[in-house]
Amino acid sequence: MSTTLLQSDLPGLPLRHRGKVRDVFDLPRDRLPADAPPGDYLLMVATDRLSAFDVVLPDPIPGKGEMLCQVSNFWFHKTEHLMPNHLMDIRVEQVLPEGVDPALYAKRAVVTRKLKPVPVEAIARGYVIGSGWKDYQRTGKISGIELPDGLRQAEKLPEPIFTPSTKAAVGDHDENIDFDAMVKTVGAELAERVRDATLRIYRFAADFAAERGILLADTKFEFGTDADGRLYIMDEMLTPDSSRYWPADQYEPGTSPPSYDKQFVRDYLETLDWGKTAPGPRLPADVIDRTRAKYAEALQRLADISVD
């Protein structure tokens, strides 16, 4: 069984950001191998924290960070021919401070290049579900994109669509925006590059997942640029936290299909008298165990990686 990590503390490494799930540290040059290419680097740690309704919950999911990191790394390498990514070929053990147990971080941390984040979430949707379903019911559109009349919940769209959203701070909510609003935020040229890369990767990943009996309903990417303006995909990639995966044999349009994610947690929280603001409630052991099992099943089916 993996060691549970709720929060990473690495003496001597400046904490750059603590998000809902990931802790990000700056890597001083003296922590890097002598042969590391020029540039600035980060250490990104996937903890076992779990968020729901934009609130970080007090109970972790044991091993979740390791599973998320392994899924991301699988997809980063699988899609290298489509898009460069932020990963650097430097082992985590080489940069950890003295006295820190490498076994705790080896499977949940990566060394990455430091990039300038594109300040928009890049979302690809192949099915009408979630916030997209709510928008469609209200307006017949998602992010300003006109869709056919009469679509049912979870129905497959004629073509995948790009639906950007704002990138909210921890505790705030992302808001769907249309492409014109994204252009005003980042410029037309960068917006088009992000849109094209998002849809290209989504189509590839959806085809790959379908071969393994999984439907990729939608996913969220984050992109960043280097000093030369080169675009990279960064943060996490096609994990159960950032994507909606459905077992193909249980898919039925007009319903809300079961998914390989934290739906057990959301369903449980919906039964509580809780205002969906911090602090979040404690989770029962069976909800934690069932959620962990879903993450493990996704890792096994997609990447053929088993966990204890």
UniProtKB/Swiss-Prot annotation:
Its EC number is 6.3.2.6. Pathway: Purine metabolism; IMP biosynthesis via de novo pathway; 5-amino-1-(5-phospho-D-ribosyl)imidazole-4-carboxamide from 5-amino-1-(5-phospho-D-ribosyl)imidazole-4-carboxylate: step 1/2. InterPro entries: SAICAR_synt/ADE2_N (IPR028923), SAICAR_synth (IPR001636), SAICAR_synthetase_CS (IPR018236). The keyword Iron does not apply. It catalyses: 5-amino-1-(5-phospho-D-ribosyl)imidazole-4-carboxylate + L-aspartate + ATP = (2S)-2-[5-amino-1-(5-phospho-beta-D-ribosyl)imidazole-4-carboxamido]succinate + ADP + phosphate + 2 H(+). PROSITE patterns: SAICAR_SYNTHETASE_1 (PS01057), SAICAR_SYNTHETASE_2 (PS01058). The keyword Ligase applies. Keywords: ATP-binding, Ligase, Nucleotide-binding, Purine biosynthesis. It comes from the Bacteria. GO terms for biological process: 'de novo' IMP biosynthetic process. GO terms for cellular component: cytoplasm. One of its GO terms (molecular function) is ATP binding. Transmembrane segments: none annotated. Belongs to the SAICAR synthetase family. PANTHER family: PHOSPHORIBOSYLAMINOIMIDAZOLE-SUCCINOCARBOXAMIDE SYNTHASE (PTHR43700:SF1). This is Phosphoribosylaminoimidazole-succinocarboxamide synthase. It comes from Xanthomonas euvesicatoria pv. vesicatoria (strain 85-10).
